Amino acid sequence: FMFTNSQIKADETYILTINKKNYFVFTDTISTAGFETSQDITKEYQINTIPDNPVVLPDILYDLAKWELQPQFEDSLRGLIEMLQVNPNITIELGSHTDNRDSHESNDILSQKRAQSVCDYLVIRGIDPYRLKAKGYGERVPRTLHKDYRYKDYVITAGTELTEDYINSLPKEVQEYAHQLNRRTEFKVISKDYVPRENISDDQM
């Protein structure tokens, strides 16, 4: 896209928004403040596709058998909050997973509470609760790694599925690391056509 000097004025700040179907909305700020002469501004952007598969949220860890979101991990959700703010028509599922220790029932309950704790935090930060779905998967969906992970001198390679049998085949000190990789919270886009409630007319309600 190109904007001419009849559209861009001196000493102004502009917000550029890029929308494309099946891509996350991208925004940038461009300022002409301080420009003394007319000049060209060239910007190149790479926009991200909305993934079909769940995205693991980094650095969200829990104490053993606990579900409260620890304050030191709240920064990990900042990028997700910004994404939801810029993309108001997206709804997401927050799915939480446990390792395979403890009973199936206990893991289902624990993972649901962990997923809900993340949803609750997002709501506190101003995200519409109708855009969020908490889902606990317990231990039923072992993680498949999309990159190599290293623990000391041991490498768990990309493509590995962290099943119970696989983890039990690892050296003892690596097993705990693999269990930690399985304990995770992910987000998945489940719809792209949500209408914010303030934009719903009386006839639609």
Give residue ranges: language-model regions.
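Periplasmic peptidoglycan-binding/tethering modules of Gram-negative envelope proteins
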Residues: F1-T91, Y130, E176, Q180, ...
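Periplasmic OmpA-like peptidoglycan-binding domain that tethers envelope proteins to the cell wall
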Residues: H97-M205
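Conserved phosphate/oxyanion-binding catalytic-loop motifs
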Residues: L94
